[in-house]
Design a protein with these regions (language model features):
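A structural signal for short, hydrophobic/glycine-enriched beta-strand patches
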Residues: 2-163
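A transmembrane-helix-recognition feature enriched in membrane-embedded lipid enzymes
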Residues: 161-185
Length: 185
C-alpha cells in the first residue's frame, strides 16, 4: 500500500526502447543469501525486462556494505540466475558501498563494455535520488524503471532503513538531503 504523501516524491519512469544494460543498485540484504523485498523487486523488474531484451546485461551493484562477508552483488546475481537470466548476462559490480559509488563503478562498466542505453532499475522511492545522482555525475542518454515494494528488515544497521514502507520513504528523503550537502546531487 502506498503512503498518502508518496505521490509528490515519486518520479515517472523513463522506459528504454532498446536497452542493452540494466543497472540495479542493491537496496539491502536480509542475510548471507537473501535480498530484501525492495532488492528482490528491483531484480525481478530487471529480469522481466531482460526477457523482452535477452541480449541485455544486468549490472548488479554493491559490495559488502552490510559486513556479511559476501557482496550484495553476488547475492543479487545468484537471485537473477535463479529467475532464468543466464550468468553470462549478469555482471557483478562489487566495489561500491553507496549510491554514488554504485553509479560511478557502473558507469565505468558501461563505458568499458560500450553499452549505449543504460537503464537504472530502482525502488520507486529511491528513483528520484538515483536519477539525480546519475545526472550530476554526467550520465547522458539513460533511462530508468521503478519497482514498488513494501519494506522488510535487513541485516545489521540497515534494519531500520528497510523495516517498512514508511522507513524507506523517510530514509530516502534524508538521503537526498545528505546527497545535496555532499554534492552528489
Amino acid at each position: 500500500m502506498r503512503l498518502p504523501f508518496e505521490k509528490q516524491w515519486l518520479v515517472p519512469d523513463h522506459p528504454p526502447f532498446e536497452p542493452d544494460c540494466f543497472v540495479i543498485p542493491s537496496y539491502a540484504l536480509k542475510d548471507h543469501s537473501t535480498p530484501t523485498k525492495p532488492t528482490i523487486a528491483e531484480i525481478e523488474l530487471a529480469a522481466d525486462w531482460w526477457r523482452r531484451f535477452p541480449h541485455a546485461s544486468l549490472i548488479m551493484c554493491t559490495g559488502d556494505n552490510q559486513r556479511l562477508g559476501i557482496t550484495n552483488a553476488s547475492v543479487m546475481a545468484a537471485y537473477a540466475v535463479r529467475l532464468g537470466v543466464p550468468s553470462a548476462n549478469v555482471i557483478e559490480e562489487d566495489q561500491s558501498l553507496n549510491t554514488y559509488e554504485n553509479l560511478y563503478y557502473a558507469q565505468k562498466i558501461i563505458q568499458e563494455r560500450n553499452f549505449r542505453q543504460p537503464t537504472l532499475v530502482t525502488l520507486d522511492l529511491y528513483t528520484r535520488r538515483a536519477v539525480a545522482t546519475a545526472r550530476k555525475m554526467g550520465w547522458t542518454d539513460f533511462y530508468w524503471l521503478s519497482a514498488y515494494s513494501r519494506g522488510e528488515p535487513a541485516y545489521g544497521y540497515k534494519w531500520i532503513q528497510t523495516h517498512s514502507r514508511f522507513t524507506l520513504y523517510l530514509y530516502e528523503v534524508l538521503a537526498m538531503v545528505y546527497s545535496k550537502l555532499v554534492g552528489w546531487v
